[in-house]
């Protein structure tokens, strides 16, 4: 399957790398098959039920590692396809941006959260203090019908507009949030909002 990935590396205002066209067409089809399944009544959970910061977000999510355990991980298209995030060509590029990223290439642990933002949903700025590194992948249906949903970094006066099929990787200490999503005349379960797949990862062993 042909790849057309573009990478941009930044050391300021904090170390991060942005990939465009990260997944190929076949991988995207597999991801959307699972996202569409989750965007049905009673599936995505509120923050209090998925480990989110209750007083900071009203978005809904699922922690896939709690659902697909051990040998059942292969039942998830997303948990299969997102192994691409941990390819050496990806982690090696991130690891050389700054010394604080250098151990990313030796990561031996990760967990995956799928999140959906619809009209009026947001995530106030926060820091994932217990995580060494973060990778956010973004998806939305075309044509895009919502506004907002940018990944925001108020402390750094910086933002990322989260294009479809993009990925941003950064250290876990970077404070970040999501601006409020606005959609007119769209039912929640039609899935025309903003999806993100978050990979929390790092090193558990010396």
Residue ranges of predicted features:
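Conserved short histidine dyad/triad with adjacent acidic residue
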Residues: 114-128
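A short glycine-rich, His/Asp/Glu-containing loop-to-beta-strand
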Residues: 103-116
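Non-heme Fe(II)/2-oxoglutarate
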Residues: 2-100
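Short beta-strand segments enriched in hydrophobic/aromatic residues
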Residues: 23, 35, 139, 201-203
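Catalytic core of Fe(II)/2-oxoglutarate
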Residues: 131, 141-142, 146-206
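Short catalytic/ligand-binding loop motif for oxyanion handling, primarily in non-cytosolic enzymes
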Residues: 26-29, 52, 121-124, 145, ...
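A structural signal for short, well-ordered beta-strand segments
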Residues: 112-114, 135-137, 197-201
């Amino acid at each position: 399957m042909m790849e057309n990935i573009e990478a941009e590396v930044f050391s300021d205002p904090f170390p991060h790398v942005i990939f465009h066209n990260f997944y190929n067409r076949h991988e995207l089809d597999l991801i959307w098959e699972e996202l569409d399944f989750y965007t049905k009544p009673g599936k995505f959970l509120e923050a209090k039920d998925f480990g989110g910061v209750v007083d900071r977000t009203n978005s809904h999510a699922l922690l896939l590692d709690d659902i697909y355990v051990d040998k059942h991980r292969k039942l998830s298209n997303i948990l299969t396809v997102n192994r691409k995030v941990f390819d050496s060509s990806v982690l090696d590029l991130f690891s050389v941006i700054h010394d604080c990223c250098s151990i990313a290439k030796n990561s031996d642990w990760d967990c995956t959260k799928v999140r959906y933002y619809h009209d009026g949903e947001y995530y106030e700025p926060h820091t994932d203090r217990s995580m060494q590194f973060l990778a956010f992948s973004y998806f939305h249906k075309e044509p895009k019908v919502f506004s907002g949903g940018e990944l925001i970094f108020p402390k750094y006066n910086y933002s990322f507009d989260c294009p479809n099929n993009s990925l941003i990787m950064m250290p876990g200490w970077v404070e970040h949030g999501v601006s409020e999503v606005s959609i007119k005349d769209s039912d929640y379960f039609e899935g025309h909002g903003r999806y993100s797949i978050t990979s929390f990862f790092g090193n558990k062993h010396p």
